[in-house]
């Protein structure tokens, strides 16, 4: 398994189109000139041995030189092939280490190869069915320009981490991270490598390797979860997050830490080896290599690390299924998934540089990160996972960042992405990337997060990622402190780009890039949770944590009239908007028009169980199932008509008062019942009046079968009568038939009798002359005839002669009647005599 995990391919910058080539090419040399090799190799010894500091060759099991020629179908390669490739890359590493990577960016000084390397590092995975464009193409597309690079730096577009938290489902196009057993992690949007639970090593299971294949598919921020680390435990992905903030996706629930894809740094390599060793401990190695945080100047070393830890601890202690929290890493690259995507880019850039800077510093970072992660693990269930989640965040594919750049990483654009991603990660703008590139080694404490405060806020957001819709880091902080603090509802975050991935039809481009549309992501990728029940329970529990009153949650049947229009409008619209977004995301493939930004309370209104339950189960039974469960739409990926109806509400003006579906249904049912009753009464009146307008009434009451029933009764009676008559007729006919048959039989008998009589007469006639002849004389002559023709003994003829006048003679003739032929012959013969 280790080898398989080592073979994890890295996804490239722009989200590769589905069905594209895998990016399993060697990384380009690091900006320092060192060739970045995959840290994903489970062989920590190799990683450590190859790790070198500034400018030194990092000869990992795989050197990452982005080559367009090296394109692999993730799904097509076997683990053995991966191992072979890995060994081959190891061989190639030394010559390639010093060769500049073709994908390097001059403007930012960050080489696309490095980013690709980090991408690959995070995404070392056994090839899966998913295809990833070659790392070079990804790097070129994502990093085609320094400005793009900076933008991409925000979430390392090189790769997005698919979140192994989702289990086998992660093998889907990473829309849904793999479910990890038990722990649910949000797939990191920007992280190429999913982080496996600390208890699992990168190579621990072939399932993880399989999930890595999904991870290999690095899409733009649209679906960070699309890339799933094979290394991630099945619980790694709770839901995908927008790629602007990979943290939300990257943030697994507190228990789930996605191994952070470390920029190709010696520290990273060392950490990856350490993490692969420590995976079961506090550290997770997404690909056997962790991001060296020291190299990044401890980019994530937040000044308020303890606060972040507390937040992480809270998250880990309370990892809502819908929200993925990852603790800031005390280590240099402690980057939350939200910030890590940029951090990942920076980490790759800075991390590679810093990895080149000093492996001992990286080792220290690893140690710090490990200790911090251990602390986090103690504090939170899987802080190490969270720590590594930050790497996944960094792994955001450049294309996704570029997509966000196209739409502008402004708050409006990135809110959706960040809402899902930014819980722990601050979006890194190209400026930040540039600064980070400049400060690869100069920035010791500041991570990709713009500030510790920001990262701290991001962490708090991670707790309540749902409401973290801030495209700007400051916004993230605002949302985090404000409505975004709605951790229970965080899961209901309005759709964000993280779940959205370039559609096949869009040719790998993001719709929001093309049309300015923002993908609406739900809190978690559909199917990311082990069970819908679990999700619902967790969400409900989280929702309960919010201090919302029934009045705030939902409209009663009378609420539209009683409640102020403002409240009603806000509550209803927000509710519908959130629900609609979530539903639309699940129903429509995650691509929606840019969703309206919601406040945390709006989310509460949307998802709070009070909305659904305070009316009473009777209403719920009549109402749509969605009301019964805030996650109903998530649980059943297909949207109900109610959800579809809610979609219409999105465009409704804010001042419009909307009735909830249950109320409408009740009203409709009541109206229908009243109408039916009225029609029945009318029909009855007509019947009593004796007016023959029953048919008219019946026509007016097509829904009520009773009028038809009356007619049917009459018709049935008529039919029965007809049937009875027919039966009688049939009986009569049968009797006639029998009589006729009897008559026919009788006629036949009469004819036979007449024939017999005729024959008898003939016999008598023929015998008359014999009377004239003495019997003695005639006996000899007649006996032959009798004997020959009638077979009678010769003695009979004399007897016959004597009794010729008696009937006894006729009886014998009749007895011989069965032989009419002979008798006829005799008669014929006798006639002449």
Swiss-Prot record:
Coiled coil: 711-747
One Gene Ontology term of the molecular function aspect: microtubule binding
Biased composition regions of type Low complexity, renumbered to the chain: 496-506
UniProtKB keywords: Coiled coil, Cytoplasm, Cytoskeleton, Phosphoprotein
Disordered, as annotated region: 178-208, 321-345, 424-452, 478-508, 602-631, 789-833
Compositional bias of kind Basic residues: 606-615
Residues with Phosphoserine modification: 222, 451
Expression by tissue: Expressed in brain (at protein level).
Subcellular localization(s) per the UniProt record: Cytoplasm, Cytoskeleton
Amino acid composition bias (Polar residues), ranges on this chain: 191-208, 803-814
Alphabetical list of InterPro entries matching this protein: CCSER
Family: Belongs to the CCSER family.
The protein's name: Serine-rich coiled-coil domain-containing protein 2
Organism, scientific name: Mus musculus
Gene: Ccser2
């Amino acid at each position: 398994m280790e080898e398989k995990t080592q073979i994890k391919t890295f996804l490239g910058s722009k989200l590769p189109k589905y069905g594209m080539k895998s990016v399993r090419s060697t990384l380009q040399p690091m900006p320092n000139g060192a060739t970045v090799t995959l840290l994903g190799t489970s062989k920590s010894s190799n990683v450590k041995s190859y790790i070198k500091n500034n400018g030194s060759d990092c000869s990992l099991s795989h050197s990452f030189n982005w080559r367009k020629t090296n394109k692999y179908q993730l799904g097509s390669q076997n683990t053995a092939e991966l191992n072979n490739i890995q060994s081959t890359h190891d061989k190639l590493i030394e010559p390639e280490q010093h060769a500049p990577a073709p994908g390097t960016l001059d403007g930012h000084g960050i080489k696309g190869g490095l980013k690709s390397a980090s991408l690959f590092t995070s995404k070392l995975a056994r090839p899966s069915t998913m295809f990833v464009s070659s790392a070079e193409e990804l790097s070129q597309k994502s990093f085609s320009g320094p400005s793009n690079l900076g933008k991409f730096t925000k979430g390392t577009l090189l790769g997005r981490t698919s979140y192994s938290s989702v289990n086998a489902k992660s093998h889907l196009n990473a829309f849904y991270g793999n479910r990890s057993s038990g722990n649910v992690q949000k797939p990191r949007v920007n992280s190429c490598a999913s982080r496996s639970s600390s208890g699992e090593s990168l190579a621990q299971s072939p399932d993880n390797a399989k999930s890595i294949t999904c991870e290999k598919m690095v899409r733009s921020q649209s679906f960070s979860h699309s890339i799933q680390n094979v290394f991630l435990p099945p619980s790694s992905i709770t839901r995908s997050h927008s790629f602007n903030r990979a943290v939300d996706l990257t943030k697994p629930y507190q228990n789930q830490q996605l191994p952070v894809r470390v920029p190709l740094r010696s520290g990273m390599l060392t950490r990856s080896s350490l993490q692969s060793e420590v995976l079961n401990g506090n550290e997770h190695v997404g690909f056997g290599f962790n991001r060296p945080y020291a190299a990044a100047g401890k980019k994530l070393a937040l000044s308020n690390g303890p606060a972040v830890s507390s937040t992480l601890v809270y998250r880990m202690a309370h990892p809502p299924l819908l929200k993925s929290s990852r603790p800031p890493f005390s280590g240099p690259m402690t980057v939350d998934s939200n910030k890590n995507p940029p951090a990942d880019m920076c980490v790759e850039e800075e991390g590679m540089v810093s990895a080149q800077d000093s492996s001992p510093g990286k080792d220290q970072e690893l140690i710090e990160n490990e200790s911090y992660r251990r602390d986090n693990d103690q504090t939170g269930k899987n802080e190490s996972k969270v720590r590594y989640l930050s790497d996944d965040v960094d792994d955001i594919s450049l294309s996704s960042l570029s997509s966000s750049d196209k739409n502008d990483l402004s708050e409006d654009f990135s809110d959706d992405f960040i809402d899902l991603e930014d819980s722990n990660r601050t979006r890194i703008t190209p400026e930040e990337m540039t600064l980070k590139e400049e400060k690869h080694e100069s920035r010791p404490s500041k991570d990709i997060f713009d500030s510790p405060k920001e990262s701290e806020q991001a962490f708090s957001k991670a707790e309540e990622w749902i409401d973290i819709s801030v495209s700007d880091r400051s916004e993230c902080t605002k949302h985090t402190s404000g409505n975004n603090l709605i951790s229970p509802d965080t899961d209901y975050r309005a759709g964000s780009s993280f779940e959205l991935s370039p559609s096949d039809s869009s040719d790998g481009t993001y719709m929001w890039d093309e049309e300015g549309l923002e993908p609406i992501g739900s809190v978690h990728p559909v199917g990311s949770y082990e069970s819908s029940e679990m999700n619902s329970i967790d969400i409900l529990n989280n929702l309960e944590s919010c201090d919302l009153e029934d009045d705030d949650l939902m409209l009663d049947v009378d609420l539209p009239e009683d409640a102020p229009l403002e409240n009603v409008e806000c509550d209803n619209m927000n509710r519908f908007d959130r629900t609609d977004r979530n539903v639309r995301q699940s129903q429509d493939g995650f691509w929606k028009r840019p969703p309206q930004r919601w406040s945390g309370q709006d989310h509460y209104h949307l998802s709070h169980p009070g909305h659904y339950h305070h009316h009473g189960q009777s209403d719920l039974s009549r109402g749509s199932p969605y009301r019964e469960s805030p996650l109903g739409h998530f649980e059943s990926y297909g949207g109900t008509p109610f959800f579809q109806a809610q979609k219409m509400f999105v465009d409704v003006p804010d001042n419009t008062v909307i009735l909830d579906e249950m109320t409408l249904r009740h009203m409709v049912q009541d109206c229908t019942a009243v109408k039916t009753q009225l029609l029945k009464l009318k029909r009855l009146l007509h019947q009593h009046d004796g007016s023959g307008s029953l048919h008219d009434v019946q026509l007016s009451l097509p829904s009520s079968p009773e009028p038809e029933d009356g007619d049917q009764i009459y018709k049935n009676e008529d039919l029965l009568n007809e049937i009875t008559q027919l039966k009688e007729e049939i009986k009569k006919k049968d009797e006639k038939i029998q009589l006729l048959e009897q008559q026919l039989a009788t006629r036949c008998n009469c004819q036979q009798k007449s024939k017999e009589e005729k024959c008898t007469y003939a016999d008598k006639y023929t015998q008359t002359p014999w009377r004239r002849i003495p019997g003695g004389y005639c006996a000899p002559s007649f006996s032959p005839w009798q004997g020959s023709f009638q077979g009678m003994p010769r003695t009979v003829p004399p007897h016959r002669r004597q009794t010729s006048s008696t009937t006894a003679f006729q009886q014998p003739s009749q007895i011989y009647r069965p032989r009419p032929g002979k008798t006829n012959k005799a008669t014929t013969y006798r006639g002449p005599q």
